[in-house]
Amino acid sequence: MRFKRLALLFIVGCAVFCANAVSVAFQIVQHGDSEIRSSSYVIEEGLFDFFFGKGIIISNSPAIASDGVENDASFFEKSRQESWEGGVDYFVELTADFSSSNSTNPDADLLENLSSLSYKVLNVGSGAVLGSGKKIPPASSQFKDKRKGLSDFAFGIADDIYKIIRR
């Protein structure tokens, strides 16, 4: 009986020792407005919900409104450096391009206000790009709940990122 207890203790100890958690950090840089849209926060919330549901430790840097692509690199580099200091495994750069020129309600959380969302997944330690992509949202008229449509779109992006991380 004593041998069984020791064997069980050894197996549990090995399992705990081998267990490790994956951590992901991200930052959303928004183009198209000088103020952060609430849509960016809905996307952020969708990413948090998705990764938390998968058991992944998730953190973010605050969303930033950028006036041009030339500033994006410095924003992302600062956030990636903070992620490295925090011991994060992966960093995701998200760029949300908004265009509300044809929108019926430019201030609302609508998919039609989002032109595209691009992402790049980096290994924080090596700086290597593991994958990237860009998605254009579907027609928002197919969603009865406009906010849910934006959240579902964020879940789709998060799923693509998750597949890159799990390769």
Predicted segment positions?
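Generic marker of residues within folded, mature protein domains
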Residues: 11, 84, 109-111
